[in-house]
Amino acid sequence: MKLLLISKLARSSRAINTITQYSRVAGELGHKIAVFGEKQLDFPELQFSLDVPAFDIAIFIIYMPSDFPDLPYLASLLDGMPKSRRVIIDCSGRYNETIRVEHDFNHLEKMDGHQGWEWIEAFQSVADRILQPTLTPRRDDVGSFLFHGYDPEGVVHPVASAAEATQHWSRSKKYGVAYVGNNWQRWTQVQRFLEAIGPIHQKLGPIALVGWDWKRRPDWAVQMGIKGADVDPEFLQQLDVETGDAIPFTELPGFLSNARFCPIFQRPLFNELGLVTNRLFETFIADTIPLVMVPEPLAESIYGPAVRPLLPTNDIGSWLQDIIRNPEPYWEAILRVRQHLTLHHSYHQRLTELIAMLGA
């Protein structure tokens, strides 16, 4: 099958790693994947095409309005591919009634100028099939497709046993804790986590936050009165937290492997809707201990029951100290989760699921 993917590309955000992985495995499975548009030199890993009729299905990967192409490219897509062969993967839960969780919304009218009904009508006008990366869509006219996946070949330091993993992990690392992700609807969770580890942060080692807008609250958020990009620079300074700009997706596994621990946070909205992101899968290929800071039902639905030791306890500081004292059982959990991800969530498995779904 020939699939044409439509989305705005960025090397440090959104679905770039997922799109690249689909492109990699497509040829191995006898399929063809290209990204709609003219060749972009920043993305040598990808094939591009404007020849819409040459493809069987057009798949729109949507986070925000800019993921839809501008005219005349959008017109070319709509004219060149029948609506029955156009699919939307709604990565942010836009195709729902308006939902608010803490400061997080699925319809950010102040930012993108579109109300909830506009999103719903736009999706319905573009495609006959709408998918969301959740096991529990809220609308009857939405299909479940997790989209993101796990790359077992990308594991930074493959090991044969938990004992071997423990020995390698116990060597000196640059960071005690590192989190890679942009400061958008995550500060509440990050702040609680840092407050919990504050008393032992010197024992853990340096802490790093990497992504957009961790140094200070951005001017646009202040001007628009939007709470989702809050941050407390003085608090970060008290813990000697190192902040850095977003990094390309190709550098992510190596960077995370420089840390003992890497928490996995998601937007409150995503936790509420059960939406998954690529970070839930990518973190498990790094040479680090993932701290799975998402709701237990969501975690077990993706990782299986083996993930339980990697879920937070009520006393996060004591939990991390126990891992440091006796890391081998936790590495045993990581290896079992990796096996589960390889079996159920590899990109080969994911693309096979998608092809079967589209061919139905």
Question: Model-flagged regions — what are they?
Answer:
Residues 45-53, 322-323:
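Short amphipathic alpha-helix with an adjacent loop that forms part of the alpha/beta core around
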